[in-house]
Swiss-Prot record:
Catalytic activity: L-threonylcarbamoyladenylate + adenosine(37) in tRNA = N(6)-L-threonylcarbamoyladenosine(37) in tRNA + AMP + H(+)
GO biological process, one term: tRNA threonylcarbamoyladenosine modification
Functional summary from the UniProt entry: Required for the formation of a threonylcarbamoyl group on adenosine at position 37 (t(6)A37) in tRNAs that read codons beginning with adenine. Is involved in the transfer of the threonylcarbamoyl moiety of threonylcarbamoyl-AMP (TC-AMP) to the N6 group of A37, together with TsaE and TsaB. TsaD likely plays a direct catalytic role in this reaction.
Keywords from the named record: Acyltransferase, Cytoplasm, Iron, Metal-binding, Transferase, tRNA processing
Leader peptide range in chain numbering: none
Annotated gene: tsaD
Enzyme class: transferase
Cofactor requirement: Fe(2+)
Localization (cell): Cytoplasm
Family: Belongs to the KAE1 / TsaD family.
EC number(s) on file: 2.3.1.234
Principal subcellular localisation of the protein: cytoplasm
Protein name stated in the entry: tRNA N6-adenosine threonylcarbamoyltransferase
Amino acid sequence: MLVLGFESSCDETGVALYDTERGLVAHALHTQMAMHAEYGGVVPELASRDHIRRIIPLTQACLAEGGKTLADLDAIAFTQGPGLGGALLVGASVANALAFGLDIPVIDVHHLEGHLLSPMLADPAPAFPFVALLVSGGHTQLMAVHGVGQYETLGETLDDAAGEAFDKTAKLLGLPYPGGPLLSRLAESGDPARFTLPRPMLNSADLDMSFSGLKTAVLTLKTRVEADLGPIDEQTRADICRAFQESIVEVLVKKSLGALKRTGLKRLVVAGGVGANRQLRAALDAACARRRVEVFYPPLSLCTDNGAMIALAGAMRLKQAHAAGSFSIKPRWDLSSLPPVNGAA
């Protein structure tokens, strides 16, 4: 079965082909980062309009890369939510229009389920059950995943997501949008011994996290350094970035290990854009190796939003496919409301 997947929940337009026998056939992606940089963040109206401009050319490019035509498709999957309403409507409209014209079914996909399942696009792929660390700009959660649609929340951030904290702290330090990846790169040249920042909720009995206070801690540190030394230079900025990243990484690693211990599981899956962070990967790899835990990541190119994860999730939910026509979007959508799937593709 060949599934075409559309992702348009925020500021990436993604299209992909997934074959239930062969795996990922092709994928195409356009990011709007440069367009939104002028405004210092995502502008929903501009995001929606850019999805409209990009989605058909990307679909054509994806089909050409895979050597397929529309007539080869068996189903179409699209991100139904959560996300920006206008952006979601673009993917939903195109998916349903194509499916209606081709007389093939559509599959509504939860964006976060796409992220949770995305490491299955790697080789080797994880087997169920596993603990998942979902860490992105909008979400930071630890979940026990027993199968498709079988998700138990073990812990989550009580305020800012880790990726959101990266972006906000980067802006505070004068880095251009999108600042999170720039902060991570700058941290690599920072001195880990120069500054220390708090590790919020590191030793709490639960598996919840909190990152909003780190921004205040960074601002306090920056203000103190500027009072003592004047405007911060590039090395000092890198040292502050390193201290910030060390704090986030230590919390994520300790909470992940706590989730593994609580569940007794021996597989950890890391998904979401922050999952591409090299220091986080290195720390998780080392900690899991000491405990004989397998750790899995999506390919680096598929850590951020993409159509491949939506096509995969759609393929694994083929039994929920339905006729095209009337459709809805869900800008807010609780992952726990998804039905379980038995015998997924």
